[in-house]
Amino acid sequence: MSVPAGWEPVIGLEIHVQLKTRTKMFCRCANVWGEPENTQTCPVCLAHPGVLPVPNRRAIEWAVKLGLALGCRIADRAYFHRKNYFYPDLPKGYQISQYDSPLCEGGRVVVPLADRDLEIGIVRAHLEEDAAKTIHVGGATGRIHGADTSLVDFNRGGTPLVEIVTEPDIRSAEEARRFLQLLRQTIVELGISDAEMETGTLRVDANVSVRPAGSTELRTRTEIKNMNSFSYIARGIEAEAARQVAVWEGGGEVVQETFDFDAGTGALTPRRAKEEADDYRYFPEPDLVPVEPPAFFHREGPRHVRRSRRRPFSS
């Protein structure tokens, strides 16, 4: 499926990278995959009353390392915030994340294509904790729609994530796929994550809108989730772009919402209205002091990153 002639997609990506530190982001529980359900937990990651988080220094260092590889500015001081929402996989009722003072921001990535180099801006790369894993039992798709029962495995809850947010500089599904392949290669070479989409250590959401070719306007965007391979991401983007073109050409209005993409059928299933920052009621995390990246990274960071990788990102 391709985008109809006369239109172009406008695509931005949100990439979640699960770091392979030995312990979780704010507690001493082991950060391992494949253990029996709900065996890698403690009062901190289960949000028992009175417990306090303690940041994982290695996760902070690795997030800075990735930010440097993406050409980001590293903050002298960054803050953690509470991102408030109520899902069963979030026992505190909020996620510890970063809002207006991220660890890394303002990066730039050059992706070589067959006919040119594509420059993609990096808005930010920030640290946060992962939610638990929800398992939907029954139904045909393994998702909440039509499921008989939902189970929660808290082993994943609290594991360290870096979220990378790109500018909407991508204009095709193929450009998105190429960028993600190079990004994954970089992450693996840095040694900070396995970055495997099959196991969820690399997860990608795509924000998609369309506009008349040659236009500079930014129209209403939607978000696509649950795409677990680069080829599925490309197919999901193309399907959503084609759907939006049909809506606009039919005289309708695209609604800002979130979709699940079913790679088997090619169907896009509405999930919920897409949230904005105000919906999460961010406020500073009172139980954590500001993060001040080690002076080592400001002094030797770029050289350290070059020693950690076999080739620059843009090759």
Language model features with spans:
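Basic, nucleic-acid-interacting segments
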Residues: 1-313
